[in-house]
C-alpha cells in the first residue's frame, strides 16, 4: 500500500501545526508501518519558490527544499524508511520550472517578461495546452541531459526507489489543443523511454509512474516498456 505525503499536513497535531519538517515525519514511521504501508510517495520537495507550496513550482532540482529540512535529514528519513521496509518515491516536476530557475534567468526577455527565443532549455510558449510557468523543451539535448543527470543524482545520492512524473503529457514539441493533446505522440514516447532507460540502468528495481492520461495505444506502449 502506498500513501502520498505532504509533511506539513501529516505532522499536524490537533489545532497546532508541528514544525512540518522531514525530521518530524521520521518520528511517525512506526505508525505508518502499522497501517500496512510499504511505500511512501513524497510530493515535490525539490527546491521551490517560497516556503508554503505543494512543490509544483520547482526552481532548483539538485537541492531539497530547505523549508522541510537539511540534506542529511532527508537522507535519514529515506534510510529509516528502508529499515522499516518502506520504499520512498519522489514526485518530480520536469514539465516546467519557475522564472527563478537559472536556465530561465540566463536567457530571459525582460521586455516581454518571458523566456527568450534563443533559450536552449525552455519554450517561449508551450506547444501544448498545459502551460505552467516556463515550459521545458524535452526535444532539446540539453534538457534531456539535465533531466537524466537529475534522475541519476536522486537515485544514487538520496537512494529514492522511484518517481512519479508530473504532467508527462506535456513532454512534447508537437502543437496540440485540449481535444488533441491525448492523441498518440511517438516523439513523447521516445522521450519517456529515454528517461526510463536512465532510471532502469541506474537502479533496475526503481519504478517510474507517469501522470499521463493519454490514449490507450500510447499508454500501452509505455506500460510494455516498463513504466506505470
Write out the residue ranges for each language-model feature:
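Conserved alpha/beta catalytic core and glycan-binding cleft of carbohydrate-active enzymes
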Residues: 159, 185-228
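Substrate-binding/active-site clefts of carbohydrate-active enzymes
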Residues: 4-159, 167-184, 195-203
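Generic enzyme active-site microenvironment
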Residues: 89, 164, 209
Amino acid at each position: 500500500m502506498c500513501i502520498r505525503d505532504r509533511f506539513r499536513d501529516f505532522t499536524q497535531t490537533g489545532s497546532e501545526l508541528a514544525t512540518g519538517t522531514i525530521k518530524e515525519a521520521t518520528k511517525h514511521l512506526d505508525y505508518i508501518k502499522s497501517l500496512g504501508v510499504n511505500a511512501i510517495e513524497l510530493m515535490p520537495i525539490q527546491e521551490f519558490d517560497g516556503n508554503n507550496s505543494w512543490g509544483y513550482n520547482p526552481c532548483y532540482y539538485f537541492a531539497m527544499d530547505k523549508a522541510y529540512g537539511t540534506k542529511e535529514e532527508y537522507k535519514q528519513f529515506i534510510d529509516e524508511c528502508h529499515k522499516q521496509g518502506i520504499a520512498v518515491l519522489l514526485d518530480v516536476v520536469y514539465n516546467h520550472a519557475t522564472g527563478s530557475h537559472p536556465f530561465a534567468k540566463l536567457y530571459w526577455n525582460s521586455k516581454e517578461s518571458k523566456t527568450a527565443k534563443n533559450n536552449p532549455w525552455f519554450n517561449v510558449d508551450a506547444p501544448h495546452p498545459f502551460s505552467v510557468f516556463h515550459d521545458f523543451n524535452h526535444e532539446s539535448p540539453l534538457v534531456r541531459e539535465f533531466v537524466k543527470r537529475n534522475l541519476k543524482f536522486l537515485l544514487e545520492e538520496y537512494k529514492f526507489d522511484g518517481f512519479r512524473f508530473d504532467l508527462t503529457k506535456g513532454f512534447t514539441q508537437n502543437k496540440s489543443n485540449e481535444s488533441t493533446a491525448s492523441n498518440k505522440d511517438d516523439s513523447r514516447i521516445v522521450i519517456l523511454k529515454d528517461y526510463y532507460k536512465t532510471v532502469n540502468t541506474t537502479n533496475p528495481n526503481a519504478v517510474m509512474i507517469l501522470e499521463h492520461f493519454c490514449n490507450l495505444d500510447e499508454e500501452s506502449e509505455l506500460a510494455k516498456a516498463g513504466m506505470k
